[in-house]
Structure formats: structure tokens, C-alpha cells
Amino acid sequence: MRALRAGLTLASGAGLGAVVEGWRRRREDARAAPGLLGRLPVLPVAAAAELPPVPGGPRGPGELAKYGLPGLAQLKSRESYVLCYDPRTRGALWVVEQLRPERLRGDGDRRECDFREDDSVHAYHRATNADYRGSGFDRGHLAAAANHRWSQKAMDDTFYLSNVAPQVPHLNQNAWNNLEKYSRSLTRSYQNVYVCTGPLFLPRTEADGKSYVKYQVIGKNHVAVPTHFFKVLILEAAGGQIELRTYVMPNAPVDEAIPLERFLVPIESIERASGLLFVPNILARAGSLKAITAGSK
């Protein structure tokens, strides 16, 4: 685990908050119970009118965007989760979902679900089932199907290929599955359990002493194989206290005998490695936060 933590050294970047206000509106329309995610703040963005003109330059941002902008963050709001898609890797940057006891029960039947392409993603940038065929990797859910038994549509949505990543079968079916089960079990102790899951592509120092970010790609669409996965659990107690549990696992076979707490890492490590920010959004609403790390109680 020391090596794992030492590897989490990528620079931090954009935050998680830009999507959550839209999520709040959609979930209110669906009469979902209020929770932490709906109260997280949207990150401030300067309005175009506030940008000073440059002498001799374009008359404003509108002129620069005359023929459109080549790419924007691809946010996807599903029945059961919100996802930010990365067209470069053919997968998600992160997926956010809310777990509650009543959502873990229902008529959702995994046998009625099939992995399928996400037609909302441009054909140039989407994964297909053919990419996984013969690759040796599982189609590993980010938002787990078992988290959303409350409706068939909610479970179906977890089978979009935009919500999966190439995952070593032993990890997917054992240690990672155990972490998903543990996440669900926390709904018995907490009022709301928010889960953010995503891939990591971590650097490794090689024989020449230099560090490189290297990862495999599969299929004709070059779907990126993460080196690691993270899972951030934001736990909201009935009294309003917020607890944070943050995990990283390598995309490799992991001995099931290793306790899950061995994979706890400081949230700062995930923020630096993923380019996401969690703590500022939480503190803006909660005011205080208890982070659980390995060895803490």
C-alpha cells in the first residue's frame, strides 16, 4: 500500500460540483429524498460579459465560438446516476450515485439487462461490446447494477458501456465486488450514502529512473484500461455528520483475504491523482468532515 499511495501524484484539476445542481432538479422531479448531493454547491464560473476585451483581439468569446467549440465536458444524467464522460479514454471520468435502502430492493432483474453502446456518445469516441470480446477483461461496472434494483430502467442504465471500464476479472468478481457490497451495507447505518467511482491512470517509475503513465488499450476503438480504480464514499448520518471513506485498488488480482481497510487512502491522494475535488464541495455545505483512513477509528 505504501507504493500505491506514493503513486498517487498526478496534478489536481477540475471539480465535481458542476453537475450536481442539475442532478438535484432531476431527482426532485422524481420525488427522490433530499440528501447531501442535492446540497453540494456548483463551482462558480465567470460570465462571458465579465471577461475584459483584448485590444485588437476578438470582440468577445462569442466570436471565438462562431463555428462551435470542439469539445466540452460530457455530462450524462441517467435514471440511477450522473456520469462525466471522457472521450479520450472511451470511458467515464467519474460516476456519482446515491444509495438508500429502498433503492437496493425492487423489481430490477439483472437477467433482463444487456451491455450496450451509449448512443449519446459520438461513434468516434464510444466503446462497443466488440472491443471487450477476447480482451481478457471484464466489463466492470462503475455504478454497480446491484445498487439500483428499485426499477428495471435504473438497472438497465448501469449497463451502458459508458458506465463500465476494462477490469481484471479476478478484481471485478472478488475484491472490488466486496467493496461494492460493503458500500451497500453502509445504508443500514447512514441516512444517505453517496458514491463516486472512477478510473485512475497512475505513473510508474521505470528502470531509467523516469516516471511514465502507461496503460493498455483494447479493441479497435482503443478503450483505455485503467491502472487503478477509486471509490469515494460520502456518508451522511441522521444528525447531519459527514464521514468520508476513500479507497483505491489496482486493476490487478487482489487477494480477498486482505481487509478492505488496507485500501483506504487519504482523499488528497485521489484528488491529486484524478484531477477532481471533493473536500471543498463537502465543506461548503457540511462545515465539518470526518475522514476515515487506514488505522483510524
Swiss-Prot record:
GO terms for cellular component: mitochondrial inner membrane; mitochondrion; nucleus; perikaryon; perinuclear region of cytoplasm. Its main location: mitochondrion. It comes from the Eukaryota. The gene is ENDOG. Keywords: Disulfide bond, Endonuclease, Hydrolase, Magnesium, Manganese, Metal-binding, Mitochondrion, Nuclease, Phosphoprotein, Transit peptide. GO terms for molecular function: DNA endonuclease activity; magnesium ion binding; nucleic acid binding; protein homodimerization activity; RNA endonuclease activity; single-stranded DNA endodeoxyribonuclease activity. It comes from Homo sapiens (Human). SMART domains: Endonuclease_NS, NUC. The lineage of its organism: Eukaryota, Metazoa, Chordata, Craniata, Vertebrata. Endonuclease that preferentially catalyzes the cleavage of double-stranded 5-hydroxymethylcytosine (5hmC)-modified DNA. The 5hmC-modified nucleotide does not increase the binding affinity, but instead increases the efficiency of cutting and specifies the site of cleavage for the modified DNAs. Shows significantly higher affinity for four-stranded Holliday junction over duplex and single-stranded DNAs. Promotes conservative recombination when the DNA is 5hmC-modified. Changing residue 288 to A: Loss of phosphorylation. Suppresses interaction with YWHAG and induction of autophagy. Belongs to the DNA/RNA non-specific endonuclease family. Mg(2+) binds at residue 172. The keyword Mitochondrion applies. This is Endonuclease G, mitochondrial.
